[in-house]
Every structure is written in C-alpha cells, then in structure tokens.
Regions:
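PLP-dependent class I/II
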Residues: 1-173
Length: 173
C-alpha cells in the first residue's frame, strides 16, 4: 500500500507562509520521480530566500505551528458562526485553507438606493466602499455567485469586519 500513499504539502498552507510558493511531496521513489519530471516543466527552481525559509520551517520546533493551527480552527469556527448570522449567505466549512467562500447571490438585484448589486463583483466593491472590508469575487475561481473572505487575521478584527458587513448588507433591499 505504501506505493499508493503520498503526502503533498507546501509552505503557504502547511506553515501559513503566504507567498512562499514551495511545495513538497513524500511518496514512494517511483511516484516522486514521476512528479519531479512533471514539476520540472513548470519551474526551474525556488529562489534562495524561499529555500532558506523552507529549511527553517521544516527543521524548527513544530509547537508554534500546532498552536497556529489551533488558532485558525478557532477563527474558522467563529467565522462560520458569523456567516450563519448573515441572511441569505450559504457556506460550506473550509477544511484546509484560511478562506471562506460563501454563496451570496441572494443579494443580487438588491439596492441601497444609490447602488444595485448585480453580481459578486458589485458586492465585493460595495463591501469595500461601504464596510471597508476587502473581499475577492468568486468569478476568479469559477464560482460567480460566491465571494472569498480570509480569516487570516485576529479574532477581534474578524468580528469587526463581519459586524460591518452585516450592517451594510442590512441596507440592501
């Protein structure tokens, strides 16, 4: 069974090192060699700063990483509770990343009197301009009825952001 078992991870997700585009695989040598051939066609190598960061991440005490993972679990739980309080938003619980991806199409066609929300792009701009909360349209991810929000921030700031979001969404009729 070892031949069919492998682990794929990366610094961005495994160690919350956003921007460090370096991944790794633990697999049977035959599988690893095949992956190496494919990967070699996509990039010529990671820069030296990323390589050094990987060494530090992979050889340091893992306790802070485990604590960080628990903190992200707390944030995810709270974000899911906050999303459940927003009428019309539907969201599956994320399992790996520190983003949520709620479906927000129940707000399409609604207006605050000066602006009508036609799509997720409009809603993202509305949230940015009215609630001062940055989101990303789901269109970029093939889900035009969704938006993406990060929970890679303190619980205090997350609470403030969702309070603002809820407040401005209540103005849409």
């Amino acid at each position: 069974i070892f031949f069919f078992f492998f682990i794929v991870n990366g610094l961005s997700k495994g160690f919350a090192m956003t921007g460090y585009r370096l991944g790794y695989i633990a697999a049977h040598p035959t599988i690893a060699k095949a992956c190496e051939k494919i990967q070699g066609q996509f990039t010529s190598g990671a820069n030296s700063v990323t390589q050094r960061a990987a060494i530090v991440a992979l050889t340091s005490d893992m306790k802070p990483t485990f604590e960080m993972t628990k903190e992200f679990e707390r944030r995810r739980k709270r974000v899911m509770e906050l999303i459940a309080e927003i009428p019309g938003w539907k969201c599956s619980q994320p399992e790996g990343a520190f983003y949520v991806f709620p479906q927000v199409d129940s707000y399409f066609g609604k207006s605050d009197g000066s602006q009508t929300i036609e799509n997720a792009d409009d809603l993202c701009m509305y949230l940015l301009n009215s609630a001062h909360v940055s989101t990303v349209t789901g269109r970029a991810f093939g889900s035009p009825d969704c938006i993406r929000l990060s929970f890679a921030n303190s619980l205090e700031k997350i609470e403030i952001a969702y309070s603002r979001i809820k407040g401005v969404l209540e103005k849409l009729k």
